[in-house]
Amino acid sequence: MSTSLLFSLSPSSSSSMRLRASNSFPILNFFLDLDATPSLSSSSASFSELSAPLSIVSRPFCTRDDPLPSDLMNPLLKSPFSLTKFPAANGPLEITCVLFKYLAIRLCWPPAPVTLLFLLLKCFLSLPLLDSSSSFTLDAAASLSSLDFLATAFGLNFNEGLADPPPLEEESFNDGKRPFPLLLLILNECYPA
């Protein structure tokens, strides 16, 4: 039997948004705040750490000469990403949210990282456009199959582990050889040149 959860999306300030579950799933109760400084514990990774509030700062495109700061990383995120790392009791819904948290850390791109993440959420779940007054249900049973779509979109391979994504350089942004085609398609649609 599938489990449906009810979410509500509402702005908590002019530059931050809140996505909060209406039940007791702690991994879902996280914040994405454009004004705060990213922070993750460098100690051993656990679901309690990953479910803590996560902040994201708008930052320049990452290049080979400008890797992601080490303080954004976590031992779990440095190791090969595998669904077998997560106990089955945590369920596909929590695994999906951990993946989103990973993407949030790795893809802190301007403009509007928070907006981009919610657009991704809309995209792979085929949901109506989200706004400050909308609510939607997420089927936990369907969320695991959605990981296949994310894996394809972001070049992830859950069987071989998660390799570092290719660097995104400003000069290659519009050269016809775009990495992360789904992300860039969304960016182009929402933020046309």
From Swiss-Prot:
A GO BP annotation: ascospore formation
Signal sequence extent: 1-14
Record note on disruption phenotype: Diploid deletion displays a weak budding pattern phenotype in a systematic assay.
UniProt KW keywords: Signal
Lineage top rank: taxon: Eukaryota
More about this protein: Almost completely overlaps RPC53. Disruption phenotypes caused by deletion of this gene may also be a result of a defect in its overlapping gene.
Protein name in the entry: Putative uncharacterized protein BUD30
Recorded name of the encoding gene: BUD30
